[in-house]
């Protein structure tokens, strides 16, 4: 959720909405028509789904925008659905080991978000550069950018892995872990931090595929990684069949095996190049300081953007940890379920980012803007339905994962309160991805600093501790902060400076 900039409606100065019978509808803003969306005819929808799953070679800078978004978004959404299924299954199995095991996962992942942030920042840079080169019809330049991104990710992973393995127990202690959590969680944390290369490479290579428009390949990579993870997880956690019962440590081992396999498969597709737009050849395998420096500059603000957003979760977790393991466990369960809804939405957002990058590369900024509003509308429809379900069915959903009376109420509160902002999140997630796809990573970075650190964390502490709202104060702060970020993002997006960014 960090880094998204949710918004429920376009800016308030629009004058009306005109519907057409095509695959789009138009929103009249200050006398200018901006296409938003209207679901395509059912026949066209299913043919688009088939095209998307097969792996389309279409030119996303030409033709109907609705069709292009559909073909890009379907594999991205299915990719994220699989990631969501893994997130829920993982916490489902770990929850059977007790609240301390769930708290271990929650605390470890709150620190892993820093690694995710680096991976996201590098992925933002890789997607923007590859998409722009593909839009310019420079496939050789796209391959060169891909090699520099992978090299940068590998070097980063080595440094982070060494630090994480050595410092894991101290890091958990700084996060407020209890003695029991430290006893069972230190090995889990070491394995997860040491295996961070699988996270970085999986993020990066799939970002390259998405930027190129090869969303179906990225989908297959993540499905493979998570299928292995889901199958192997319970075997290593509970000792099924010939496998040893490793407890929470088994979950970490299964995760790294699954992600590592996916990363190797993805790299093989880049090198083989049989069906991918980006084909890495032998002459590309060299460091190019000029290309890498452009990538570093682009990724640095993207990484900072993600770090600011995800690191603020650590501040929220620190506040929640003062209320005990039950609160942490409930929050972890609730957030994992929320991820189930938001990750598919990130699929739609990624589709919008790819459309923006390629359209700007083809010198079609109006097409880029139309694609963003259309993707946002689809996202709003989806998250609106999911938000209602979470509010109404929060307790039955929480009971799927645990019946512990010390945990369930906090999971229910997490689901209900954060889901209230889903309509806001919908457009904002797409807007945030659009800025990044255009290479304008600094705008979301500044917004994240203001909203998450100067607004959300102080507000969370005020509500939870000073005004005695308890954990609910933290959940409210999340929803309020994202709503604020949404409105600010919409204003800046309308100004259109992102259209002039060079990558």
Residue locations for each model-derived region?
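Short alpha-helical transmembrane segments in multi-pass integral membrane proteins
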Residues: 7-73, 130-197, 231, 243-300, ...
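N-terminal transmembrane alpha-helices
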Residues: 56, 60-92, 96-97, 110-125, ...
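Interfacial/gating helices of multi-pass transporter permease domains
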Residues: 71, 93-113, 179-187, 248-249, ...
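Short runs within selected transmembrane alpha-helices of multi-pass transporters and secretion channels
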Residues: 123, 192-210, 218-226, 251-267, ...
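Residue-level hotspots within pore-lining transmembrane alpha-helices
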Residues: 82, 86, 115, 119, ...
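Transmembrane helical elements of multi-pass membrane transporters/channels
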Residues: 70-90, 191, 225, 258-262, ...
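Small-residue-rich hydrophobic transmembrane alpha-helices
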Residues: 102-162, 199-218, 330-394, 425-447
